[in-house]
């Protein structure tokens, strides 16, 4: 059931930015209130990212009101905060479909709207992309403006600073809006800051400043005195020295919920020359008290009743793989004081909350810095510590060079606990863990394990921890099978699989949790079902023995078929001249769309029914 737009009379008049810009300025505060309430009612019915969007309502309205989007280009970082942007750009009536199969994409997406100029999902890309657009805008000479909106978390990543450094060097006209909702840069927000921002972004101030530079250019002592006076004035209330050193003109911080101040400041800044940075202070979850008090809990929400002011409690069902990892980490830390846990800004998602509380001195959240996380782990390993890097599959992609150069090349004992491997579901193609087996399998000295259930996951984590070189355990998002998890930890035989069901004719080699979906197919086809456990080193002896007693193979994995575990089986069989027909089942050669995990596995033929159907059709062909 969709939200009744008749309850939002001002928002009903602003289905697009063109309509928004036709509204009188005086109506914007009421429009913002309606937009915030509409967002709350919509997301609570669909599930999705809530707290970030509640905090960017006024900023979104102001940007589209001042800038001529889509001609002027507005680039959002990550995209969690872009729900108000979607509502104001012709997608309001489809918001209930967000993150659902065939629905709106969870993040800004180029194929969805002309207002989404950059497809996003991973952090810290906005400034670099916006700079490229700014260079192109200068070349085309049409007066196009470019704005990047980035959060205080995303701006900490190395590539954001690389882009800031480059932008300050080439000095193109662009605006970076720093959406600061964590008070991590400055707490100075209020009337004085808003007033100063208006002054410093205004024409009179900038004219005097630039003119003064020219007049005083021949008088170094006087020029230096004037510069210091300006810095002293700004330094009393402005934490912008860092950005000024990058070559940006820094304005702010200003109240990101004061629509009047935002519009006036953006109007003043719109035609300023060179790189500009506007520091905006916002409150995550603004306008909905439960989200203001618990912005982490309300970052991503299931369907809920906002009038009850509480989220539904998770059912006490099967533990998630993340929880299994978190418990193993605590148990292992109790046994080995050298263990160090590392995560790039994914404490809650990776199951590290308990560990961070029990072992705060051995827990490191390095922020959105995947490359640093891996090299930091390498340094710890060199110093005889035992680092465990908890990281999402899709985010490990950013640290590939560090994994090769700083860890694997030096055969350092770093354990990678790779969460969200396989299909994650509603977050869509930017977050599907589709490639980790493929890119890890090519790395020498790497051990890669694929647990079929949560008990195997625990034992594999222990196995990887005992390795003398780099090891990876990949496991999916969501709950396990409900199997009894053994408290005792035992190292598995390295590179050895196990036969789950003995059959004949066809041997199904399963890598990971899809083993559970293959059981019914194996029964129906009287096929042998194997839990391979290790992608690398692979159980070659087991594969060879199966090749001698079976007519064909089926490989099964929740990774891209190209370069994946099935490809490793193909290579092994061809190299040994024991060529057998092989059907590789896994993720296709495309970016996999959003939907529930169950929907997408069924769509790709990787649920129980689909696996059996694919094998039967292949055997009959």
Swiss-Prot record:
The keyword Metal-binding applies. The keyword Magnesium applies. It holds the Pfam family Transketolase_C. Its EC number is 2.2.1.7. Thiamine diphosphate binds at residues 80, 121-123, 153-154, 181, 288, 370. Its cofactor is Mg(2+); thiamine diphosphate. It catalyses: D-glyceraldehyde 3-phosphate + pyruvate + H(+) = 1-deoxy-D-xylulose 5-phosphate + CO2. Catalyzes the acyloin condensation reaction between C atoms 2 and 3 of pyruvate and glyceraldehyde 3-phosphate to yield 1-deoxy-D-xylulose-5-phosphate (DXP). NCBIfam families: dxs, PRK05444.2-2. Homodimer. This is 1-deoxy-D-xylulose-5-phosphate synthase. It comes from Aeromonas hydrophila subsp. hydrophila (strain ATCC 7966 / DSM 30187 / BCRC 13018 / CCUG 14551 / JCM 1027 / KCTC 2358 / NCIMB 9240 / NCTC 8049). The lineage of its organism: Bacteria, Pseudomonadati, Pseudomonadota, Gammaproteobacteria, Aeromonadales.
């Amino acid at each position: 059931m969709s939200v009744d737009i008749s309850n939002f009379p001002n928002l009903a008049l602003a289905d697009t930015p063109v309509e928004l810009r036709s509204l009188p300025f005086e109506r914007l505060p009421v429009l913002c209130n309606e937009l915030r309430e509409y967002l709350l009612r919509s997301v609570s019915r669909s599930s999705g990212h809530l707290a970030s969007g509640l905090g960017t309502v006024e900023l979104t309205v102001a940007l589209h009101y001042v800038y001529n989007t889509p001609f002027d280009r507005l680039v959002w970082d990550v995209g969690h905060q872009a729900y108000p942007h979607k509502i104001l750009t012709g997608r309001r009536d489809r918001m209930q479909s967000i993150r659902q199969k065939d629905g709106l994409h969870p993040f800004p997406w180029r194929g969805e709207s002309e207002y989404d100029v950059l497809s996003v999902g991973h952090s810290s890309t906005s400034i670099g992309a916006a700079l490229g657009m700014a260079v192109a805008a200068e070349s085309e000479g049409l007066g196009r403006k470019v704005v990047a909106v980035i959060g205080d978390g995303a701006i900490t990543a190395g590539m954001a600073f690389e882009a800031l450094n480059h932008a300050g060097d080439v000095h193109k006209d662009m605006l970076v809006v720093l959406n600061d909702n964590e008070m991590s840069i400055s707490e100075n927000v209020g009337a004085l800051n808003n007033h100063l921002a208006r002054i410093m972004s205004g024409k009179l101030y900038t004219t005097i400043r630039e003119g003064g530079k020219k007049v005083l250019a021949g008088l170094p002592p006087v020029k230096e005195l004037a510069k210091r006076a300006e810095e002293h004035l700004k330094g009393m209330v402005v934490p912008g020295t860092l950005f000024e050193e990058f070559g940006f003109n820094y304005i702010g911080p200003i109240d990101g919920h004061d629509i009047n101040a935002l519009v006036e400041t953006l109007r003043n800044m719109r035609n300023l020359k060179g790189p500009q940075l506007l520091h905006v202070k916002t409150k995550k979850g603004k306008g909905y008290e439960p989200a203001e008090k618990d912005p982490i809990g309300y970052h991503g929400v299931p369907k809920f009743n906002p009038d009850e002011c509480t989220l539904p409690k998770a059912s006490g069902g099967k533990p998630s793989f993340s929880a299994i990892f978190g418990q193993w980490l605590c148990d292992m830390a109790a046994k080995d004081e050298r263990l160090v846990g590392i995560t790039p800004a994914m404490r809650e998602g990776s199951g590290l909350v308990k560990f961070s509380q029990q072992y705060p001195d051995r827990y490191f959240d390095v922020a959105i810095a995947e490359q640093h996380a891996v090299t930091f782990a390498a340094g710890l390993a060199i110093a005889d510590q035992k680092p465990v890097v908890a990281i999402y599959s899709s985010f490990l992609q950013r640290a590939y060079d560090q994994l090769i150069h700083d860890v694997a090349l030096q055969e350092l004992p770093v354990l990678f606990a790779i969460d969200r491997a396989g299909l994650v579901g509603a977050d869509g193609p930017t977050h599907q863990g589709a490639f980790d087996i493929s890119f890890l399998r090519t790395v020498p000295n790497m051990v890669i394990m694929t647990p079929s259930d949560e008990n195997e996951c625990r034992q594999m984590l222990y196995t990887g921890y005992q390795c003398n070189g780099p090891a990876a355990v990949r496991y999916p998002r969501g709950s396990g099978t409900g199997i009894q998890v053994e408290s005792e930890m035992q190292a598995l035989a390295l590179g050895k699989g196990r036969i789950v069901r003995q059959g004949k004719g066809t041997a199904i080699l399963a890598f990971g949790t899809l083993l559970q979906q293959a059981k019914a197919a194996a029964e129906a086809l009287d096929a042998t079902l194997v839990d391979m456990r290790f992608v690398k080193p692979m159980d070659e002896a087991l594969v060879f023995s199966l090749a001698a007693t079976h007519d064909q193979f089926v490989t099964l994995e929740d990774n891209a078929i190209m370069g994946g575990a099935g490809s490793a089986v193909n290579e092994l069989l061809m190299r040994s001249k024991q060529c057998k027909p092989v059907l590789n089942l896994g993720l296709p050669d495309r970016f996999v769309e959003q939907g529930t995990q169950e929907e997408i596995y069924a769509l790709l033929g990787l649920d129980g029914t689909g696996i059996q159907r694919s094998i039967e059709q292949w055997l009959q062909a």
